[in-house]
Amino acid sequence: MKVALETELTNANELMSERHFKVLAVASHPVQYMAPIFRRMAAEPQLDLHVAYCSLRGAEAAIDPDFATSVKWDVPLLQGYSWTAIPNKGSGNESFWGLNNPGLSNLIHDGKFDALLCFVGYVRASFWIARGAAKASGAAFLFGTDAHSLAPRDGKAWKVVFKKAFWPFLFRQADQVIVPSTGTFEMIKSLGIPDSSITLTPYTVDNDWWKAQAAMANRETTRANLGATSQQLIILFCAKLQPWKRPMDLLQAFAEAGPEGSILVFAGEGPQRPKLEAEAAKRGIQRRVKFLGFINQSQLPALYSAADVLVLPSVYEPFAVVVNEAMCCGCPVIVSDQVGAARDLVAPVNPEFIFPAGDIQALANLLRFAFTDRERLREAGRRGFAHVETHSPERLIAATVEAIRKAIEVLRHEK
């Protein structure tokens, strides 16, 4: 009897591994990083993918509150996969009711999906609409977080207390928790969620696109447009100019360590810009500090290729796919220890390029190293270029298919 039962379970698992899964991905809005992944998922033989958007911000021009400017990405966001825009009854702002898409319920019920991948945060009403509809329809429900600690962006202690109490309950709502990094995996595990309920689905970008675009870029032309010669060092900051990204730390470290021939480039917009401009003027380095404003996706590969090093000194950074992007373009990366990508992408190949967040002197020392040993800097870029393939779309999709399989198996055993 035991042998027969084991054989039955083995056969069921083999059938599950070969099964074609009908999947709905629920996303808050089109994102330039996810669109190519959705296209790849749509081409995956084991998946029948449909995407439901709660908003079309990003594909349509709209104010991005963090960039503090209107953003419309200049790469295809809605091509190559099946999608639906669900009417939003909410205001569209960042509040709980900002995304309120009751139409998700009918779509999920009528679609008879095997699984839902939810990319809407639990602080939005639409997350709970999707969760309720998945449960009612019998679909597996998968979601996660990119956070690698309980620390909130604004540092408020009550939020840590809340997360400690609520997050164990929250993540038990998932039939499988999907996480983008080792740090996130360990954080979810610390909440009491078992290993078997967590799948690492590594954050990635469209590596092939970034590498191809970088190969076509004219490095010297881009550098000349930035006012740099072939001998000058370009330090790049590519992110929103927000306090938690700590662009001021980089500016101050650059002012202390940067020789006359070096250039600091800020690619991004945000509320910190006036303070940065004032600080550069105060320190007398305004001619060596460039503010490019918001840079759209199609222009970024050339910028990474022109830079000698990317620096991200954030004190709060769940992951940072700019690290993936830069590595795909052969640009070495210096990051703080609070950047989620540090552990999986930077530490394995260039651990000396990680510094304690908020330590301006440590960052200045790393910049001095960059200025004085250009060949080691280039070698760091080559190592990063090779290592970023561990975070490829193929690996992400294979892991996602496995997570879906495990989630459906959990539901099957619960019935």
Which ranges hold each PLM region?
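Nucleotide-sugar donor phosphate/pyrophosphate-binding loop at the beta->alpha transition
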Residues: 125, 140-142, 149-173
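Conserved donor-binding/catalytic core segment of Leloir-type glycosyltransferases
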Residues: 229-254
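Conserved acidic donor-binding segment of nucleotide-sugar-dependent glycosyltransferases
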Residues: 347-360, 369-374
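Short alpha-helical donor nucleotide-sugar binding micro-motif in glycosyltransferases
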Residues: 294-295, 302-307, 400
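Aromatic "clamp/platform" in nucleotide-sugar-dependent glycosyltransferases that forms part
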Residues: 315
